[in-house]
Amino acid sequence: MHELSVALSLIDALTESLGTHPDVRIEVIHLKIGPLSGVIEPALRSAFEIAAVGTIAEGAILAIQVPPIVLRCEECGQETNLSGADVMDNRDGLGSWISWLPPACPACGAAALTVVGGRELELVAAEVRRG
């Protein structure tokens, strides 16, 4: 379960940035997690809850934004956005998204699509309370 490693790394990064002052608490952590990042949101939430115990992030809320998958045609340059929810709802039984992605560019028909967005795993911001 690599979500635990992600949660621990997130807490380490925030603790390093904010220090370990007893009067500092993280209330909300804003993340951007692409549907192709390999991170399963419910597993990350559970792992984070466990990893945060006894840290400045204990009790913090994870506010997660899911950006679209962006495909670019190498022939015509057309970019196509696919919502992460659509892809996640259409995965096959093995959790694969590849079989659902369009095989060709909707604009020119070329089978030359490259994924240029949707793999994000970013710490965007943290809302902190002092005192």
UniProtKB/Swiss-Prot annotation:
Source domain of life: Bacteria
List keywords of the entry alphabetically: Metal-binding, Nickel, Zinc
Keyword Zinc in annotation: yes
Q: Name one GO molecular function term.
A: nickel cation binding
Q: Which residues bind Ni(2+)?
A: 2
Q: Name one GO biological process term.
A: protein maturation
Family matches, as Pfam families: HypA
Please list the residues that bind Zn(2+). 73, 76, 105, 108
InterPro entries attached to this UniProt entry: Hydgase_Ni_incorp_HypA/HybF_CS, HypA/HybF
- Is the keyword Thylakoid in the record? no
Family of the protein in this entry:
Belongs to the HypA/HybF family.
What does this chain do?
Involved in the maturation of [NiFe] hydrogenases. Required for nickel insertion into the metal center of the hydrogenase.
Name-wise, this protein is Hydrogenase maturation factor HypA
Organism expressing this protein natively: Thermomicrobium roseum (strain ATCC 27502 / DSM 5159 / P-2)
The organism's taxonomic lineage, starting at the top: Bacteria, Pseudomonadati, Thermomicrobiota, Thermomicrobia, Thermomicrobiales
